[in-house]
C-alpha cells in the first residue's frame, strides 16, 4: 500500500538565533535530505521532495505494514521537530472498483423510482 507523508516544521522547533539555525541545518536538515535521497534510490520513497517556500517534506512511500512506515518516518533525523501526517492512498482502479456496486444500487433505485 502507498502512503502520503506530510511533514512540516513544528512552531516550537523554529530556530531563534543564527547559531541554532546553523545547528538545525547541519544536524537535522542535511542528514534528512541525504537519507531521503538514499530512500528514493532504494525505492522506499516513490516520489516527493521538499515543500517550496516552507520548511517541510512531502513524499509517497510504499509499505506493507505500519511498522515499515514508522521505521521510515521516525528514522528521519528531522522527525522529532516536525508535525507529521500519514495518509493511506488507494489506487485509481481500486477506488473505481469500490464505487461500482454503489453506482449499480443507485441506478436500480433510480429506475425503480420512475415506475
Language-model features: where?
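Conserved, structured core segments of small domains
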Residues: 1-115
Amino acid at each position: 500500500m502507498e502512503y502520503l507523508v506530510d511533514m512540516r516544521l513544528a512552531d516550537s522547533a523554529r530556530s531563534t538565533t543564527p547559531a541554532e539555525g546553523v545547528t538545525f541545518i547541519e544536524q537535522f536538515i542535511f542528514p534528512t535530505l541525504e537519507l531521503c535521497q538514499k530512500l528514493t534510490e532504494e525505492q522506499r520513497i516513490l516520489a516527493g521532495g521538499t515543500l517550496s517556500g516552507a520548511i517541510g517534506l512531502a513524499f509517497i512511500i510504499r509499505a506493507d505494514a505500519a511498522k515499515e512506515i514508522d521505521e521510515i518516518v521516525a528514522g528521519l533525523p528531522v522527525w522529532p521537530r516536525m508535525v507529521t501526517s500519514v495518509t493511506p492512498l488507494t489506487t485509481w482502479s481500486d477506488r473505481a472498483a469500490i464505487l461500482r456496486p454503489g453506482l449499480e444500487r443507485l441506478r436500480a433505485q433510480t429506475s425503480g423510482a420512475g415506475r
